[in-house]
């Protein structure tokens, strides 16, 4: 998969199969209170009868799709991917005929996608609810002026553990590694994404996970392939519910997916969530419209609809990620949503987050990921 993407993009642009990574986002506290913004989605024009998504799995409340159809008419179809690379490869291979209207890339991929003609330039006048976003989540470094993207949500990477499998508390990435090699050996999952997998080594050692230093990449490969991979049962980008169903004892996970696992179990006290230290990941996912979409009015209508504060709050309850809408934290607290410490992070936690990058090391990380899969014990 990675090779097809690398070959498809001109100019030697390297894209990894990273699940989520970005390079600018707001801090841990919202700095806003109470405001609710616009509450009615304004139609961008007569909508078509269909809207096609290429999307991360289980990433929006199914009831919201039905609500959109009931209110505006377009039926929705969703195909899913597990990594940015998989999504980009399919768009490139389709040569503008994918049939998709909306895709949801992570921030750092947007400049290359836009430069290679995969994304529409947005007319923000057709998205009046854009004003509901906090300014911390607009005008990101990888898309100044929101020319091609609008924040969907943002989050980080940690783990979820079954405490009947690993009784010792896991506080750091080194604790995670020790548990993976010890009581959870053969019963762990890691994210099915090269940069998140290799990130474990860099984060545990307090290193820059966007490094291009050959010696550091060699050390990462030795650890990932020889030390960690033999203990891995599965490469799974959505392990939260699977773990609480007994499929894993320890899983690397994005915060919202881990929260979905806790919400799905009758005994959440059996499990523990943790954010890695000394460092871990920061990412932002974004609504974008595919170049020459078959249903452009419906695509604009959807983005405007999902930025409605009421709709955004409903979606947050489902997926467990901060949507960046003004007042959403206060609204979630008022609604007594569960496990909000997994959604809204403290400033101290955010201080440990580091953004990813697309650079010359990405292909090497893909190679390490492939070698790790071959060496995995599962």
Regions found by a protein language model. Give the residues of each.
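Mature extracytoplasmic/periplasmic domains
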Residues: 285, 290-350
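N-terminal export signals
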Residues: 1-19
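Short beta-strand->loop
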Residues: 120-131, 149, 268-281, 290-293
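Early extracytoplasmic/lumenal segment of secretory-pathway proteins
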Residues: 37-112
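A structural signal for short loop-to-beta-strand junctions that line the ligand-binding cleft
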Residues: 98-105, 120-161, 186-188
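Ligand-binding pocket segment of bilobal, Venus flytrap-like solute-binding proteins
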Residues: 189-193, 197, 201, 208-276
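Conserved C-terminal helix/tail region of periplasmic/extracytoplasmic solute-binding proteins
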Residues: 241, 346-378
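Bacterial lipoprotein signal-peptidase II cleavage site
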Residues: 18-29
């Amino acid at each position: 998969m990675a090779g097809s993407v690398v070959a498809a993009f001109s100019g030697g642009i390297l894209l990894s199969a990273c699940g989520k990574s970005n390079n600018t986002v707001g801090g841990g506290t919202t700095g806003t209170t109470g405001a609710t913004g616009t509450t009615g989605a304004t139609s961008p024009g007569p909508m078509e009868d269909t809207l096609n998504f290429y999307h991360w799995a289980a990433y929006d409340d199914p009831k919201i799709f039905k609500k959109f159809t009931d209110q505006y008419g377009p039926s929705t179809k969703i195909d899913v991917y597990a990594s940015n690379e998989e999504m980009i490869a399919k768009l490139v291979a389709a040569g503008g005929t994918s049939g998709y209207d909306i895709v949801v890339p992570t921030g750092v991929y947007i400049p290359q996608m836009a430069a290679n003609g995969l994304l529409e330039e947005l007319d923000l006048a057709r998205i009046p609810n854009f004003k509901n976003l906090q300014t911390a989540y607009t005008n990101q470094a990888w898309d100044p002026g929101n020319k091609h993207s609008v924040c969907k949500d943002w989050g980080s990477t940690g783990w979820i553990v079954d405490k009947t499998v690993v009784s010792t508390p896991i506080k750091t990435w080194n604790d995670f590694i020790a548990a993976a090699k010890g009581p959870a050996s053969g019963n762990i999952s890691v994210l099915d994404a090269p940069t998140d997998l290799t990130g474990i080594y860099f984060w545990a050692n307090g290193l820059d996970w966007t490094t291009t230093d050959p010696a550091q990449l060699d050390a990462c490969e030795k650890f990932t392939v020889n030390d960690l991979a033999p203990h891995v049962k599965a490469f799974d980008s959505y392990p939260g519910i699977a773990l609480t169903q007994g499929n894993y004892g320890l899983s690397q996970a994005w915060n919202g997916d881990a929260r979905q696992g806790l919400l799905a179990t009758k005994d959440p006290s059996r499990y523990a969530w943790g954010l890695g230290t000394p460092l871990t990941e920061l990412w932002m996912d974004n609504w974008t419209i595919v170049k020459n979409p078959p249903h452009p009015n419906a695509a604009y209508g959807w983005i405007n609809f999902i930025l409605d504060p009421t709709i955004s709050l409903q979606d947050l309850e489902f997926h467990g990620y901060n949507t960046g809408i003004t007042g959403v934290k206060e609204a979630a607290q008022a609604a007594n949503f569960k496990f909000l410490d997994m959604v809204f992070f403290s400033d101290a936690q955010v201080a440990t987050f580091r953004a990813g990058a697309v650079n010359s090391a990405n292909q090497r990380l893909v190679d390490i990921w492939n070698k790790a899969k071959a060496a995995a014990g599962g």
